[in-house]
């Protein structure tokens, strides 16, 4: 950027009616080179140290003289009328510079005029003449003197150099353009003078002196001898500076336009406000009045009404252009949009409610019975606090979809929020209004969306709530799900109590283990366990197949699935307690048929079991079915996972070893390993009762294995199974055919109850098991299960391990190569033979 160092002289110094400005654009001939004649040079030239400026040949500029030595030099040069040398300092902060503080190249200069300024300072108007090389400083008092060597400025040859002419012209144009972009434009006289000056050296030096860059860069330009090279270097710097100036100008223009726009809008708003006030109101008043009118129809308490009116008065005092206006308006609109005292009318037709539940879901009798009971109480009493129900069970059994059916059967609105992965307490309680972008929590948002205060509210995946430094959402749910507290639920954003006691909350979970105990205590737990194969067949025939046919463009009866086909589909292509994967496999079959129909191929209208391999490929799963058992040490246990029950084979083998050892394999967890250790220790302690010789433990090593080693297994319920397996292996007694068991074992031989009984029973029935051994305390769990699940099963309830072994083991022994007892007898015979040999040796001696 070109520096604006113009000094206006007095009125009496005007020439031809124009004030004189500096730097002065000298009226010079086109070929003038500003050289100094050698005979005009002094042997020792006064040297003036310049701070923060560079003087170029031909350029005139003001120098503010501040240092005492510099003032003496100016007085001396003015009096004698001689030249002096102007050299820039490397560091402007140095007060007493020496040779090392000065650049190597300076400019011979002459004084045009010395001005005494009104503030008492002295300003010298000087003009550069020719460059020189500073050789040495010869004196420092009363001012610096030194020897110099003149340096020529090399112009192109006498023949016209069109490239150089174009270069100079470009520099001149860019300099003028930069003047036009300046915030305060230079005087018109300066611009006109620069346009008229055709001296190439002057044009280059003037632009070099006034470009906005560092002193070091300007000094670099001064030290370039060839004017053409100096011009190209200058052109690069000018181009760079011009880009910056154009960008600044663009930014300033945009800023100015934006400010003008804002001022215009402000004035228009003021005018509109004035006009509306003259007419009797304004926009703000109209909006507030509409809200106040709507508030008269609300069925809210006096506390809410007072709070709303107070917040509305705050809104009235705010200007619509205020940043707080939109925040306050949002809060007021949130209050008035909530369903205060608005309720859906319950449908008390119990038969219709039962038919809706039966239509949408097969089975799940316990859940349906609980909903009908709630409706019956409402019908008799007219009002009651809604229950907090938690449906827990494996995926795909219909827990979430059951909420929709319950809402339809009751005639209520349905809302659902997913809590999976939720880790911020503010998602439940909302954010305080002091935060930017604050809003109410998801509970209040859902009620706002429902439009009633008594919807069926599904809290999906409540067992997958997380917590972090932002808080624990499960703790916030304690207030929501407590019938004694939720009649005054406090949302941080709303800051007003809201009644949730009429909301029917239904939570869903896959497992109860990850839910906090206080939260569990507030909910009524209903086990939605898996379906048996007969139920899955009915669900597929009634719901899944018709649904998928319609979704794929068929009518409900266009394609038939036989019962055996559905059973094979369930057995060979799914492994779940629910029906989600079953629906996917049905959809896959129908897609294949849809493709046939779309290609005008004769498509299948009835799917047989043999067609499944064609449509779905080879069976994905092979069920662990009981095939009979003739081996000692192989016992069937029952396990339970989040996706349902499974049968579990536990195998025990023995092999000879030098020392006793128990080996456990099959990816077992710590609890299951402990069960094996307890089982073996119990057998050792009661070996006499079980008919097992202690010598066996000293000479045989025990290996317990649970197949499917890639799957982690853990839990205490395999305790009695491991005892039975070990006793069978050690005694070689056969295990009763078709029997499975589950239960925990103690060191005293007591059998303790376990969980997941229904899932385990379904797994046993699915695998062809006919008899099950359970703990006596699990009898109550069996009594709660529908008889349809128990058909074909015989239960043995036990309290100790002796009863387990009595029911599970036969007296018949397995005949195989592992002859433990012959090994024991052989050992005794060997000992007797050894003793006899020892006695014979002693007699011979």
UniProtKB/Swiss-Prot annotation:
Domain Lon proteolytic: 629-811
Location in or out of the cell: Cytoplasm
Domain Lon N-terminal: 45-242
Gene Ontology, cellular component aspect: cytoplasm
Alphabetical list of SMART domains matching this protein: AAA (SM00382), LON (SM00464)
Pfam families xref list: AAA, Lon_C, Lon_lid, LON_substr_bdg
Coiled coil ranges: none
Active site: 717, 760
Listed GO MF terms: ATP binding; ATP hydrolysis activity; ATP-dependent peptidase activity; sequence-specific DNA binding; serine-type endopeptidase activity
EC number: 3.4.21.53
Residues annotated as binding ATP: 393-400
Swiss-Prot/TrEMBL catalytic activity: Hydrolysis of proteins in presence of ATP
Alphabetized InterPro entries for the sequence: AAA+_ATPase, ATPase_AAA_core, Lon_bac, Lon_bac/euk-typ, Lon_lid, Lon_proteolytic, Lon_Prtase, Lon_prtase_N
Main location: cytoplasm
PROSITE patterns: LON_N (PS51787), LON_PROTEOLYTIC (PS51786), LON_SER (PS01046)
Family: Belongs to the peptidase S16 family.
Alphabetized NCBIfam families for the sequence: lon
Protein name (Swiss-Prot/TrEMBL): Lon protease
Species the sequence originates in: Porphyromonas gingivalis (strain ATCC 33277 / DSM 20709 / CIP 103683 / JCM 12257 / NCTC 11834 / 2561)
């Amino acid at each position: 950027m070109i520096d604006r160092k113009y000094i206006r002289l007095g009125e009496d110094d005007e020439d031809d009616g124009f004030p004189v400005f500096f730097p002065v654009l000298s009226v010079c001939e086109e070929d003038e080179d500003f050289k100094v004649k050698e005979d005009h040079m002094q042997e020792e030239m006064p040297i003036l140290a310049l701070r923060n400026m560079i003087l170029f040949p031909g350029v005139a500029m003001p120098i503010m003289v501040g240092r005492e030595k510099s003032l003496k030099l100016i007085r001396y040069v003015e009096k004698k009328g001689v030249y002096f040398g102007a050299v820039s300092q490397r560091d402007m902060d140095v007060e007493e510079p020496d040779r090392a503080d000065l650049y190597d190249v300076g400019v011979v200069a002459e004084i045009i005029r010395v001005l005494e300024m009104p503030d008492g300072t002295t300003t010298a108007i000087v003009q550069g003449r020719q460059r020189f090389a500073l050789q040495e400083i010869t004196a420092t008092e009363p001012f610096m003197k030194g020897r110099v060597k003149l340096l020529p400025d090399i112009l192109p040859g006498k023949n016209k150099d069109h490239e150089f002419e174009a270069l100079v012209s470009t520099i001149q144009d860019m300099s003028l353009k930069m003047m036009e972009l300046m915030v305060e434009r230079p005087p018109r006289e300066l611009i006109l003078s620069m346009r008229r000056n055709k001296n190439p050296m002057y044009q280059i030096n003037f632009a070099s002196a006034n470009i906005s860059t560092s002193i070091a860069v300007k000094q670099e330009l001064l030290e370039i001898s060839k004017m053409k090279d100096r011009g190209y270097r200058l052109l690069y710097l000018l181009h760079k500076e011009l880009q910056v100036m154009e960008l600044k100008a663009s930014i300033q223009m945009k800023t100015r336009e934006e400010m003008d726009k804002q001022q215009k809008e402000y004035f228009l708003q003021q005018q509109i406000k004035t006009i509306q006030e003259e007419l009797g109101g304004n926009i703000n008043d109209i909006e507030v009045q509409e809200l106040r009118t709507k508030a008269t129809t609300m069925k809210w308490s006096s506390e809410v009404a007072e709070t709303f009116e107070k917040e509305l008065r705050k809104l009235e005092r705010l200007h619509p252009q205020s940043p707080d206006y939109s925040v306050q308006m949002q809060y007021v609109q949130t209050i008035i949009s909530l369903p205060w005292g608005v309720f859906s009318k319950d449908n008390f037709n119990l038969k219709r409610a039962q038919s809706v539940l039966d239509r949408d879901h097969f089975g799940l009798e316990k859940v349906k019975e609980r909903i009908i009971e709630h409706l019956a109480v409402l019908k008799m009493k007219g009002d009651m606090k809604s229950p907090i129900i938690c449906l827990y069970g494996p995926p795909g059994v219909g827990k979430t979809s059951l909420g929709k059916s319950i809402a339809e059967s009751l005639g209520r609105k349905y809302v659902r929020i997913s809590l999976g992965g939720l880790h911020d307490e503010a998602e439940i309680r909302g954010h305080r209004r002091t935060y930017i972008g604050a809003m109410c929590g998801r509970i209040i948002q859902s009620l706002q969306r429902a439009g009633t205060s008594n919807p069926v509210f599904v809290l999906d995946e409540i067992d997958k709530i997380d917590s972090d430094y932002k808080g624990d959402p499960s703790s916030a749910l304690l207030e929501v799900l407590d019938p004694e507290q939720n009649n005054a639920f406090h949302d941080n954003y709303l800051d007003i109590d809201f009644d949730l006691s009429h909301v029917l909350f239904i939570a869903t979970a896959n497992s109860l283990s990850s839910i906090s105990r206080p939260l569990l205590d507030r909910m009524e737990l209903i086990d939605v366990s898996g379906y048996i194969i007969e139920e899955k067949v009915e669900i597929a025939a009634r719901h899944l197949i018709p649904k998928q046919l319609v979704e794929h463009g068929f009518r409900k009866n266009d394609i038939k699935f036989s019962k055996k086909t559905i059973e094979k589909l369930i057995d060979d292509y799914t492994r779940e307690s629910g029906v989600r994967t079953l629906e996917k496999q049905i959809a896959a079959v129908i897609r294949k048929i849809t493709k046939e129909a779309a290609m005008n191929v004769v498509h299948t209208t009835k799917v047989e079991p043999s067609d499944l391999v064609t449509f779905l490929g080879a069976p994905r799963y092979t069920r662990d079915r009981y095939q009979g058992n003739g081996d000692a040490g192989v016992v069937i246990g029952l396990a339970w996972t989040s996706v349902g029950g499974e049968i579990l084979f536990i195998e025990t083998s023995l092999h000879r070893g030098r020392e006793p050892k128990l080996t456990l394999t099959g990816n077992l967890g710590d609890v299951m390993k402990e069960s094996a250790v307890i089982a073996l220790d119990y057998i050792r302690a009661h070996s006499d009762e079980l008919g097992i010789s202690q010598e066996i433990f000293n000479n045989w090593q025990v290996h317990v294995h649970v197949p499917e080693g890639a799957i982690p297994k853990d839990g205490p319920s395999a305790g009695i199974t491991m005892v039975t397996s070990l006793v069978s292996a050690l005694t070689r007694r056969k295990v009763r055919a078709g029997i499975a068991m589950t239960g925990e074992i103690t060191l005293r031989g007591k059998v303790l109850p376990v969980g997941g009984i229904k899932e385990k029973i379904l797994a046993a029935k699915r695998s062809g098991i006919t008899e099950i051994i359970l703990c006596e305390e699990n009898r109550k769990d069996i009594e709660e299960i529908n008889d349809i699940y128990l058909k074909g099963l015989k239960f043995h309830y036990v309290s100790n391990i002796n009863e387990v072994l009595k029911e599970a083991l036969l007296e018949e022994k397995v005949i195989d190569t592992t002859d433990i007892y012959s090994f024991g007898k052989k050992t005794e015979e060997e000992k007797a033979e050894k003793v006899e040999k020892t006695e014979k040796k002693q007699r011979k001696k």
